[in-house]
Amino acid sequence: MAANRDFADYCCELLSSVGPCLAKRMFGGWGLSLGGLTFAIIADLGDGDKLWLKADADSRAQFEALQCQRFTYSGQKNGKPVNMSMGYYSAPVDAMESSLAMAPWARLALGSALAAQRL
């Protein structure tokens, strides 16, 4: 099921501490961006709509310490099924409660997106 607009708007509110978030439809979900830079996505990988935050080598451990899931999906490579992953982690459960709780995670995600842009 495609992610709904209300959830996308709510996620943008949660991420508002880093600036005005724009939600755009993307591959059946949503891309959340600031100034054209995508730093979060919303997707349903089979267990409902979820907010996924951009992570990098510097921030990955912080997400994993809270047992956040890595964005992983089934795909094919050379005609064989494989699990593929992207540099996004599910938002911590507690952070989904308020923009104040989400603020440090929003900064991490935006920082990861900025770092990836410089590469």
PLM region spans:
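Amphipathic alpha-helical interface surfaces
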Residues: 7, 11, 55, 59-62, ...
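Noncatalytic, solvent-exposed loop/strand surfaces
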Residues: 6, 50-52, 87-89
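Well-ordered alpha/beta subsegment
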Residues: 89-119
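Residue-level signal for pocket-adjacent positions within structured domains
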Residues: 21, 58, 86, 91
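Short, conserved beta-strand/beta-arch hydrophobic-aromatic motifs that form part
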Residues: 26, 32-78, 82
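N-terminal first-folded block
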Residues: 2-38
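Short, intrinsically disordered, mixed-charge
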Residues: 13, 57-69, 107-115
